[in-house]
Swiss-Prot record:
Residues 515-528 have a biased composition (Basic and acidic residues). Pfam families: HSP70 (PF00012). The lineage of its organism: Bacteria, Pseudomonadati, Campylobacterota, Epsilonproteobacteria, Campylobacterales. Belongs to the heat shock protein 70 family. Keywords: ATP-binding, Chaperone, Nucleotide-binding, Phosphoprotein, Stress response. Acts as a chaperone. One of its GO terms (molecular function) is unfolded protein binding. Gene3D superfamilies: 1.20.1270.10, 3.30.420.40, Actin, Chain A, domain 4, Substrate Binding Domain Of DNAk, Chain A, domain 1. Induction: By stress conditions e.g. heat shock. NCBIfam families: PRK00290.1, prok_dnaK. This is Chaperone protein DnaK. The modification Phosphothreonine is found at T197. It comes from Campylobacter hominis (strain ATCC BAA-381 / DSM 21671 / CCUG 45161 / LMG 19568 / NCTC 13146 / CH001A).
Length: 634
């Protein structure tokens, strides 16, 4: 049976794990690192780079380097967070059927497609590590992700060629990794602050049960926002000093982003750091340099309100669970942004106790996802995971009211139904508008989709009985159905449109991904062939020069001709592996004659050396006589 991998698909970095021989292990990527940057780049040569290689070239290719794609996953263009992302991110965010997408060199990609490229790399790294094909996966999402964001994440997995067995919440996965071996029941809080999202979850763990009591968060708050505070400060300071606004310079902004991220990390251990960006821009007076020293206190002042938001959410979630802060035994810190000292200080202050830092904040979520995969496969038995829906679900009713069918915090999977009626006499159809959120009016909540129930028998208003049923699966993904109880006529909708992709589009993207996979493989083979050919050409040229006149003129001419043919094909960027291999083969054949000539020369030199050695022996004999004479003198 093939193994199940657990994937933490993060805003900034991603991580993959597998459950083997009774424990979850992090799978290193091909670069030897435990985490992979969630970055995808498109080069001018048509290459697609993923991970570290994509991140390294971001400064020189900012408009075609995609990072933080998770921030617009499943978002519609008219949402506030989408507009904020559009202002902040250097690449082009466009409208695709109402949903967010990115445009690179005239081609539109959905967030699902970009995320799929990261997932494909993680999948390939796992296959390389395990030595077998990997299909099944458990992927994590922020607890506060809505239905469309969860659906989009699952679609990304499908496009990447994965069978997504389960979508689980990141804090729940962390708790699963932390609490699996806990025998005594204890209430814990998982405070998860990552690169782009924030979640806090109250759970009860013990005796192989992990039960979510309450959850909350912000799907648009994380380390990126800390970076943005630093960026805004540096932009303002530079403008005040130089009079130049570099906000519109994408390359300068990318340099600034990387510098801000590094400054944030340095301030986690140092009391101050210096941002030094020479030649950031220029005007008629010459080049301009950005240099600014930032203290930890200054940085903490910038992010204080953001950290305060997380503490406010923390208080609300503990209250929603019906608990007091003193009821919490452990506070588990998850996510790279929990390394910021102010974050730890404020959370510690809220609980009045030391924080649990026993888990690796970058890896624990993937570890828990792998445990969940093992539970689904039956490799880990008697573990029960009870998760909850993060937001209430309902429909729009008369007067634009949101009528809730499933309250937030309901354990999933779950199914709830309620009977409604018509608003007008002889109404023959109703439109069901499915909503998610906590506000009283439909317009203030997120619409996940709508569908019609036709063929209702004519009757006075209030008489027809229409049963609406909500069914949430273990992934937190919703299906809604409506039935006219008089006629038995029914219709349903799996909320798929909310992610912006139809089943046909997903199928096409899966095929496109497979097609690109083959193209990438061919391109890599071509690069490997070029590298090998270049090494052979260099070695042949070196040997030619070293041997000089020892190579017969006619043989030298043949080798040089074959060498020039190979160099010519290497200059052609469109040359195929087969064309390169053919020229390498031709050069190798002629070079063999050269190496034979070189070998013959060495053998001849060996014979001469033998005679020389005999002569030397004679000299040695003479020297020996001299030695004897010297001895006699003594």
């Amino acid at each position: 049976m093939s193994k199940v991998i657990g994937i933490d698909l993060g805003t900034t970095n991603s991580c993959v794990s597998v459950y083997e021989r009774g424990e979850s292990k992090i799978i290193p990527n091909k670069e030897g690192k435990n985490t992979t940057p969630s970055v995808v780049a498109f080069t001018d040569k048509g290459e697609i780079l993923v991970g570290d290689s994509a991140k390294r070239q971001a400064v020189t290719n900012p408009e075609k380097t995609i990072y933080s794609i998770k921030r617009i996953m499943g978002l519609m263009m008219n949402e506030k967070n989408a507009q904020e992302a559009k202002k902040r991110l250097p690449y082009k965010i466009v409208d695709r059927n109402g949903a967010c997408a990115v445009e690179i060199a005239g081609k539109v990609y959905t967030p699902q497609e970009i995320s799929a490229k990261v997932l494909m790399k993680l999948k390939e790294d796992a296959e390389s590590y395990l030595g077998e094909k990997v299909v099944d996966a458990v992927i994590t999402v922020p607890a506060y992700f809505n239905d469309s964001q969860r659906k989009a994440t699952k679609e990304a997995g499908t496009i990447a060629g994965l069978n997504v067995l389960r979508i689980i919440n990141e804090p729940t996965a962390a708790a699963l990794a932390y609490g699996l071996d806990k025998k005594e029941s204890e209430r814990i809080v998982v405070y998860d602050l990552g690169g782009g999202t924030f979640d806090v979850t109250v759970l009860e763990t013990g005796d192989s049960v992990v039960e979510v009591l309450a959850t909350g968060g912000n799907a648009f708050l994380g380390g990126d926002d800390f970076d943005n505070k630093l960026i805004d400060y540096l932009l303002s300071e530079f403008k005040n000093e130089s009079g130049i606004d570099i906000k519109g310079d994408v390359m300068a902004m990318q340099r600034l982003k990387e510098a801000a991220e590094n400054a944030k990390k340095e301030l986690s251990s140092a009391m101050e750091t210096t941002v030094n960006l020479p030649f950031i821009t220029a005007d008629q007076t010459g080049p301009k340099h950005l240099m600014k020293t930032i203290s930890r206190a200054k940085f903490e002042g910038m992010i204080d309100n953001l950290v305060g938001e997380t503490i406010s959410t923390l208080n609300s979630v503990v209250s929603d669970a019906g608990l007091k802060m003193s009821d919490i035994k452990e506070v588990v810190m998850v996510g790279g942004s929990t390394r910021v000292p102010l974050v730890c200080e404020e959370v510690k202050k809220a609980f009045g106790k030391d924080l649990n830092k026993s888990v690796n904040p970058d890896e624990v979520v993937a570890v828990g996802a792998a445990v969940q995969g093992a539970v689904i496969k039956g490799d880990v038995k008697d573990v029960l995971l009870l998760d909850v829906t993060p937001l209430s679900l309902g429909i729009e009713t008369l007067g634009g009211i949101m009528t809730k069918l499933i309250d937030k915090g309901t354990t999933i999977p779950t199914k709830k139904s309620q009977v409604f009626s018509t608003a007008e006499d002889n109404q023959s159809a109703v439109t069901i508008n499915v909503l998610q959120g906590e506000r009283e009016f439909a317009r203030d909540n997120k619409s996940l989709g709508n569908f019609n129930l036709d063929g209702i028998m004519p009757a006075p208003r209030g008489v027809p009985q229409i049963e609406v049923e909500f069914d949430i699966d273990a992934n937190g993904i919703l299906t809604v159905s409506a039935k006219d109880k008089a006629t038995g006529k029914a219709t349903d909708i799996k909320i798929t449109g909310s992610s912006g992709l139809s089943d046909e589009e997903i199928d096409k993207m899966v095929k496109d991904a497979e097609l690109h996979k083959e193209d990438d493989k061919k391109r890599k083979e071509s690069v490997d062939a070029r590298n090998g050919a270049d090494a052979i050409a260099h070695q042949t040229e070196k040997t030619l020069n070293e041997m000089g006149e020892k190579i017969p003129a006619d043989l030298r001419a043949k080798i040089e001709a074959a060498l020039n043919d190979l160099k010519a094909v290497l200059k052609d960027e469109n040359a195929t592996k087969e064309q390169i291999d053919a020229k390498v083969s031709a050069l190798s054949k002629t070079a063999e004659e050269m190496y034979k000539a070189a070998s013959a020369g060495k053998n001849a030199g060996g014979t001469a050396g033998g005679n020389g050695n005999a002569g030397s022996n004679g000299n040695s004999g003479a020297k020996k006589d001299d030695d004897v004479i010297d001895a006699e003198v003594e």
